[in-house]
Amino acid sequence: MSSFPTRVVALYPYRSSFSDDLEFDPGQVIDVVSNLDGDWYTGTYVDSDGNRKIGSFPKDFTEPAEDAVFVERASEMALHQPTPTSAVHSRNSSLGYAPSITRSIKSISNNTEHLGADTESYLSANDFIDSTSEALTKIVDVDTLSAPFGNDSNSRPHSLKNVEKLHTFSAPYTISEETPSCSTENDSLPLTATHTITGGEDAATGAAVTNTTTTHITTSTNTSTVIPSNPNSVFLVDCTHSQCPTDLPNIATTQHSLRYLDNASASAITVLERTHPAASSTMATESSHQSPSADSQAEELSKSQRVAKDDDPFVVSNTANSDEPASSSKPAKPLTDLNRAFSQRLNLDPQKPGKSQGEISEQEEDEYDDAESDEMHSPYSTHEPESEPEDQDEPSEKDDENKDVEEEQEQEQEEEQIDPEEAKRIALRERMAKMSGGIGMHVFGLPGLAAPIGRKNTLRRTPAKSSEEAKSTTNDSSPPKDSSSTSTQPTEQSNAQQAPSPKEEERPLPSEPSQNQPAEYRDTPDTPRNIMPLPGLMSADQPIKVTEPSNDADKAIVAEGPNNEEETKGPVIPETQETSEQQVHKTPSPEKQKVLSPPPIITNFDKETLASNEAHEAVPQKPSAPQVTRLMAPQDSSSVVTPSPTSLLDPARAVRKVIDGIDPPKEAGAGATADVESAANSPITPPRTWHSPDFTSKSFEPIERKLPSRISEVTEDSIDEDKQNEVDPSTSARALPPPGLRFGKVDTLASLAHDDLDDLPAVPRIFSPPPLPKTPSGEFGDNEFMFPKKSNRVRGHQSRPSTGSQLRNVVPVSIVTSGGRPALPDEMASPSSSIGHPLPSPPPADFNSLNVDFYEPHSYLESPAPEPQPSYEEESFNATVIHAPTPSTATFQGHPTISNVATPPLKQDVTESKASPVADASATHQSSTGLTQEITQLGSNMRLPTKLTRPSNDGRKASGPRPAAPPSIPPPLPVSNILSSPTSEPPKDHPPSAPLSKPVSTSPAAPLARVPPVPKLSSKAPPVPLPSADAPPIPVPSTAPPVPIPTSTPPVPKSSSGAPSAPPPVPAPSSEIPSIPAPSGAPPVPAPSGIPPVPKPSVAAPPVPKPSVAVPPVPAPSGAPPVPKPSVAAPPVPVPSGAPPVPKPSVAAPPVPAPSGAPPVPKPSVAAPPVPAPSSGIPPVPKPAAGVPPVPPPSEAPPVPKPSVGVPPVPPPSTAPPVPTPSAGLPPVPVPTAKAPPVPAPSSEAPSVSTPRSSVPSPHSNASPSPTSSSMASAAPARTSVSRSKSKAERHETSTSSRKSSKSGEHHHHHNEGHADSSSTRTSLAHQDSRKSLHRHLSRSSSRASKKPSIVSTTGPFNESFSAKPVEPCASEKWWLNSTAVPKSVVQMNDSVLYMIKEGITGQDKKYKSVHILFPDYSQTVLTATFNPHNQNITQLSQLQLAPPAQPSKARLDEEYACYGSTILKKARAYQGSMVGDGSAFTFVNSVMSILAHNLEPINKQTFGGVIYKNVGNVTVQQIGEIRPGDIVTFDKAKFSGQKGTLRSKYSLEVGKPMHYGIISEWDVSKLKIRVLEQGRESKKVSVASYKFGDLKSGEVTVWRVMRRSWLGWN
């Protein structure tokens, strides 16, 4: 059951040449009456004239109407046709014989091409084929089925449509019961058995019918059979009888059946024309029980023969064909190849007409003898009496007259009968034979046992005889009654004898009896080589003597026997022995004396010999030496026959030697046949001429390639035997090659010239060996390739390098790794082996450092290759093991060391390498360099697939293999060896090294007894430019140079024992100076416990400004005197390169007086709070967090700031010195006033100071940081903030510098351990949470200070190839709070994009709003805002790009067309003749699409949906789906040029300047032409225009299918 609409609308015009088809134009509404099988409908409509039309039409030309109702109805054939069982009467008596069904068809129709297809489709559709039926008969009207096909549709169901005409007869037809369906007697006689097909009554006349034809088949006199009235019918007879011949070809199609029957009929008629009238009378007698008169039957049969000869009709193939004796009034006609093949298929002897093996009755044999005797005494017979045997070999005159006609018939029949597959093989073998010099056909005929002579006779569509049948069948020489004991020669020789040469003479058989004497295998010159005699033909004591051939070209080797009296040409096949007397006194019949010889093999290439006629004749030989012409396979080379030098000219030998040089057989006997067959099936055998190097002009010796692929060795005996068998070419010009083929090495390619190499015979690609490696000597490494040296290889290597170096003689080195690096190969270069290496050898010094022990090469070569073991200690040799560290370790573990197997304790463990320090870095580096060079050279020589890489040292996991440095370039120094020398300086731009296990020893600086002059800066340190007024100050580095002390100042003691007992009182600070709070982010620095040494300033460290800028005054508590500060005594403090310039203070510090009573610099007992760093925001600093030490009390003096790195710090005294009085001449330290530059206000544009990690105080440092300047300290606001814009590199440098300064402080400031311990403890506790607490505090303070929303905006990666680009998020508009609002940047895009808004909830207190912006190429930019509806200030904005969707499939396009296609077409046609909008093309298309719902609107007037068809100047054409009415078409600068109209007038048209749009109303597939509804091009009204895609010369034409939004995922 199938559903169909009740009403359809025509999309395309339909025209048909059939009168019962319904023709219509586009837009026609058709009422569907019924549906037909094969996508056809039957419908009706009323035309414009009021006439109702009805007919069938294809449904592909229509579409369902809008008001159509789909109904379900059975197919027309199922409704109107009877059941299959009413047309077949079957009996279940032949189950299992369905595979042997043979179809026979008789037809007089001229149109047989469509007959087979229609008949099979009809039978398969009705399921009429019943394998259980004994005979199946169907009638098919030929006139109906042979009607021409329509031109409009390829899927028209002709056979289904004409089903109504098939049942013109009311009753089915079956095979009559009186006559068996297939009998043995009918098979043995020609055209005497008639299958009488009976049936019911004619539907029109009511008379009984029988499906037979009187003009072709003799009918029976049965009363139940009547000749049918309708001759134009086809009879299908399927024979399933158990006695049917099973060797008939299985014809699959009706067309094959017709062709087969045509050929079989022609052969049967040809046989009947040559039969004797007695045979006709015999057949009439045999069929007398079926016909009233034998004479009338014979007359009717002769009439049918003449008609069959003229009309060449088809004949039922299951009637047997046989040859009858020749008539006395008509000379016999020789059998053709087709007739012979047909008779052989029916098991008939081709030389004995009317004979069937084992199936002829005694009556038939008597009739045969009578007919034979009549033929012998007939004056018209070609057979002469026994007394005149000399004239029997003359051909008849009738044969000469009909010779040309027979040849033409044979050629036509051969062309029709040759199977295509067999024809290909014939053509291939003929081509190979011609290439091989003309005689290779005898060799290439071996595969498949197809003889080269008369080979086309065996290529009929009849089964070939089996080997047992060929041995059991006999030749014509024996009497008919002894058929059971006779034997026949092979099929090849039978065919060869049946096609004689016109110049060959026929000679009678020898009268002497032949004795059963077995003979060995011999070769004869005039027969194909490799001849094997049949058993039972020669006696055991009858030798075959071979004489030396003479110099004459027309003579060959003559075989001699006991009787040498008579000579005969060609091969002699003796009769089967009955008795010697019978063979001596009996004269054979003339048919038995016509024994033809095959053409000889020509082995002489002399032009005179080829031109002579004698070269085509057989050489006489002795009659007593029987000879058999069966082709045998090449045997072993143990033949006694002496070969001649021309045997080497046999192309088969050359081909065999070339092929066996590549892939010789394992055994000589079996492999020879297989290789010959392979060579015969190979189409790449080259031609061989006298100019080819395969044949030398002197010795006729073929030169073969020397290929090292399993070449079989040849012993000296076999080579000597070959030399003995060679004969001078002048002794004989014609000889056969030896039966066995021997394969040996003759010459190599090195003995040939370069020009000769190009002419060498090609070899099939399948036998081509792999390319051989070249040795240094330039020859092919045959011995190496055949017998490779056994070695202990490391698993994973597949090939060995073939170089001339000493790598093969070196011990393989096994690499034992703890990681995943690949193992090295089994060869390693020695220090002296530099020959053939791509890279130079490493120096001996580096190589000796490897500590590798090599053993003697001979032990490696002589030892057999053991199986690969998991452990290398069981090897018989001293293997060298290299232990390398794991590349994935987090820290540097040292360099790999090489240890000998004999010293296992030297193996370094991976876990120990982490904690073990590097003792000698230079020695390790040297070993590492040598190892790297050695491994690199090994990897380069051994063709490692991957290189070795150095393990990672930065704490990350190593990725990939270790890179190898060239041997000539030393690898870079390890990180831990950079500061291995006390005097070595780190390289420029080198990352700081890891701390060493031992501190670097430096000389401490001596304390100053007086105020020293300002030290000069190094020449490498550039001066610091003066800072600007707006630049914020920077903090002073963690260390600073010592403050110079006047000469009268007592020296600072080096130990705590010299400290004063009590500190002097400190004056109270001024009220204007605020106290400096300790921020949570800056850890306090404890008081120094000692005097640090003056380190050497770094090269990259810039100079530090004067102490007047870098050292601010120490705020003193109330009552404490101010601390004197020298202005010029301190050396400059180096400032990092990345720090901003330090502002110059407005008030200069006064110089420090040098009286004798000047007190020393007071030393505070506790650490002073650190100075906060400037920030861009500078919020107020809160109270210190937990863990931060409080501000020191006023009774204690503040600490002395520590200078930067590279400047010695101020040596503080253990106790505070007394404050100088004005009477002493020391002015007090001035307090900064309002004249000091204020700290710049926080702003978003002010750059934040990024302090390098080297200038940040270390958590383990004992020196306190110093503020940047006195003005900054005094004018610092109450609240500040710290910027955290520091990169990873800066933090890494900070940590490295902190560790170094910590170790340095511990080493040089151990004299004040108490203060150091207390300060270190507080600092470490404060440093743990300083960063996190400061960040949290800054976040809270920032939110309190400014109520602006904190918006984080992220943008994903965007592909430049798409149109989608990032847009401005417009965060200040807060568009995400309004459901319908979009960013202003999206609104400004106007019609160039489409956008869609999505909203949702992602979690608790989290909402999102997404704006999908669609660009013309359908790529999208998705702008998403995630926010908290309760707290709108916290928002996250993100943008990402979406690629265009995939191209829609055909099924999706069909669905989209079903949604919008009909609606668009109907709306567009409604506008035809009127103006839409402003009259532009886009307005018309946009107005039509505006009525649709859920579709994608046009974007930027460029895209309208999915692309169906795209043509760019007829150069690039892309078609995805079928163009249909209702699709949108766009023209962009398109130019059409061509011819149109009935007069083929030229036209030129330009469309699309600017872009033009339209809606397709019609589409002609054959012309590639569209009709478009458009407006705005020629007029402002909607009109129809046509365009041909084939006339497009330039520009672009695109057809769009309107798509739904779901295609983009928009719901």
Swiss-Prot record:
Compositional bias annotation for Pro residues: 963-974, 1022-1053, 1076-1241
The signal peptide here is none
Q: Which PROSITE patterns would you find in this protein's record? A: SH3 (PS50002)
**Gene3D superfamilies linked to this entry:** SH3 Domains
Q: Where in the cell is it found?
A: Cytoplasm
GO: which molecular function terms? myosin I binding
Q: Which UniProt keywords apply?
A: Cytoplasm, Phosphoprotein, SH3 domain
Q: Name one Pfam family in it.
A: SH3_1
Bias-annotated ranges (Basic residues): 1300-1312
Q: Which GO terms describe its biological process?
A: actin cytoskeleton organization
List residues, modification Phosphoserine: 1258, 1261, 1266, 1379
Q: One GO cellular component from the entry?
A: cell tip
Bias class Low complexity marks the residues at 472-494, 637-648, 1242-1278, 1340-1350
Q: Where is the composition biased (Polar residues)?
A: 278-296, 316-330, 576-586, 799-808, 886-902, 923-940, 1317-1327, 1351-1362
Q: From start to end residue, where is composition biased (Basic and acidic residues)?
A: 300-312, 421-433, 605-619
Identify the residues that the record assigns to the SH3 domain, covering every copy.
3-67
Q: Where is this region: Disordered?
A: 275-648, 662-741, 762-851, 886-1365
Q: Which residues carry this modification: Phosphothreonine?
A: 1380
Residue ranges with Acidic residues bias: 361-373, 387-420
Return the PANTHER family for the record.
NEUTROPHIL CYTOSOLIC FACTOR 2, NEUTROPHIL NADPH OXIDASE FACTOR 2, SH3 DOMAIN-CONTAINING PROTEIN C23A1.17
Name of the protein in question: SH3 domain-containing protein C23A1.17
Whose protein is this, by species? Schizosaccharomyces pombe (strain 972 / ATCC 24843)
